[in-house]
Amino acid sequence: MSAGMPINPKPFLNGLTGKPVLVKLKWGQEYKGFLVSVDGYMNMQLANTEEVIEGSVTGNLGEVLIRCNNVLYIKGMEDDDEEGEMRD
């Protein structure tokens, strides 16, 4: 197994701002949406958020604020993976 280079999380998250992301919480929930902003504590604001359970979308939540200590991971999604565009 090869070790990857460590990534500073703040520039990584700032680079994802305005892009579609998938956020998985420690408790198993997954949310897809557009990352609107990240604060100094790494709390995240998502727009056009959808809840994903077992790979399928179960509901549209709209705008969501996720507290930093609940996040297991966040990953950027390809434009092909996310339908629609960011709306205000």
Swiss-Prot record:
Lineage: Eukaryota, Metazoa, Ecdysozoa, Arthropoda, Hexapoda
Ranges where the Sm domain occurs: 8-80
The protein's role, per its UniProt record: Plays a role in pre-mRNA splicing as a core component of the spliceosomal U1, U2, U4 and U5 small nuclear ribonucleoproteins (snRNPs), the building blocks of the spliceosome.
Compartments reported by the entry: Nucleus; Cytoplasm, Cytosol
Descriptive protein name: Small nuclear ribonucleoprotein F
PANTHER family: SMALL NUCLEAR RIBONUCLEOPROTEIN F (PTHR11021:SF0), SMALL NUCLEAR RIBONUCLEOPROTEIN F SNRNP-F (PTHR11021)
Record's subunit section: Interacts with the SMN complex.
The keyword Chloroplast is annotated on this UniProt entry: no
One Pfam match: LSM
Principal location listed in the UniProt entry: nucleus
Similarity field: Belongs to the snRNP Sm proteins family. SmF/LSm6 subfamily.
SMART domains documented for this protein: Sm (SM00651)
Gene this protein is translated from: SmF
GO BP annotations, alphabetical order: mRNA splicing, via spliceosome
Keyword Nucleus: yes
